[in-house]
Curated annotation (Swiss-Prot):
Residues 1-20 form the signal peptide. One of its GO terms (molecular function) is dystroglycan binding. Monomer and homodimer. Interacts with LYPD3 and DAG1 (alphaDAG1). Interacts with MUC2; disulfide-linked. One of its GO terms (biological process) is mucus secretion. Keywords: Disulfide bond, Endoplasmic reticulum, Proto-oncogene, Secreted, Signal. This is Anterior gradient protein 2 homolog. It is found in: Secreted; Endoplasmic reticulum. Its main location: secreted. A motif (Homodimer stabilization) lies at residues 45-54, 60-67. The keyword Disulfide bond applies. InterPro entries: AGR/TXD, Thioredoxin-like_sf. It comes from the Eukaryota.
Length: 175
């Protein structure tokens, strides 16, 4: 019985030593990764265009759209999503998109809203939708995919520009 107790005790000591050593090695290894660099403060743009004016919440964006009589452009994305990252890079670097975006109330969301009109064909990212100042979701302004109507790829900049212009043009003819 004594041999079993001593063996169990030694096994526990060895196991706890191994686990303790693993946790102390991991933080040292992280020093070389990009995670250890000081992070820049997060802005509302989240990298989609720092010079643009972005709203913080969906409710604030709807209010600004209605009071300013500008259409609302909503970008649904995730920080870890490679498709979202690729679209963000193209969106932020395209001068024509950035210039046209100034005529919109802008909101980018990394979470879903409670408004089911903003996900008529499912919750996927990246997804760009437009809402006019009368607070009507513009379901007619779609991307090129039939299974993800509001999805855009980095190669879809011309289509996105056309849809942004369509949102502005139809806004003027509806009022």
């Amino acid at each position: 019985m004594e041999k079993i107790s001593v063996s169990a005790f030694l096994l526990l000591v060895a196991l706890s030593y191994t686990l303790a050593r693993d946790t102390t090695v991991k933080p040292a290894a992280k020093k070389d990764t990009k995670d250890s660099r000081p992070k820049l403060p997060q802005t509302l743009s989240r990298g989609w265009g720092d010079q643009l004016i972005w709203t913080q919440t969906y409710e604030e964006a709807l209010y600004k759209s209605k009071t300013s009589n500008k259409p609302l452009m909503i970008i649904h994305h995730l920080d870890e999503c490679p498709h979202s990252q690729a679209l963000k890079k193209v969106f932020a670097e395209n001068k024509e998109i950035q210039k046209l975006a100034e005529q919109f109330v802008l909101l980018n969301l990394v979470y879903e809203t409670t408004d089911k009109h903003l996900s008529p064909d499912g919750q996927y990212v990246p997804r760009i939708m437009f809402v006019d100042p009368s607070l009507t979701v513009r379901a007619d302004i779609t991307g090129r995919y039939s299974n993800r109507l509001y999805a855009y790829e980095p190669t879809d900049t011309a289509l996105l520009l056309d849809n942004m212009k369509k949102a502005l043009k139809l806004l003027k003819t509806e009022l």
